[in-house]
Amino acid sequence: MNFDEIIDRRGTHSQKWDMMEPNYGVPADDGIPMWVADMDFRPPDCVTQALRRMTDHGIYGYYGDDTGYRAAIRWWMETRHGWRIEPDWIFTTHGLVNGTAMCVDAFTDPGDAVVLFTPVYHAFARVIKAAGREVRECPLNMADGHYEMDFEAYEAAMTGSERMLILC
């Protein structure tokens, strides 16, 4: 992978670059699009090759279960984190926002509060509010150029209605 290669993605239907001006009034030439986790470097060759093998087949129907996919996740969790997980614990969603919305719906009730340490990805608050839950913000402190949790402020902000905390 080459992290030094500059790839201009403007005008390529890139939400990150092409939606900055319509969404925020900032032309792509004048801003740094830090509002979405979308990378501007090419993926590893093995990923590109795997995708090409799939598209070369020429049929794009619904994708079924892939035991290799689940095995890779299980290997990663055990190797990197010492956590042995079962294949049926793995539930794939179509993106972070969908997965977050599903968790908010599954683990909280309307009116419950969900804690967010801010600044954080803006879509989390939108998902929480859309589900009829309350966003409980706990601002992070900026110290020596990095963010730190303020545990005293966190404890002071809690009212007892919180049922979920999202760390990002």
Predicted regions located by residue number:
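N-terminal small-domain helix-loop-helix segment of the aminotransferase-like
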Residues: 2-95, 102
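Conserved core of the PLP fold type I
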Residues: 60-168
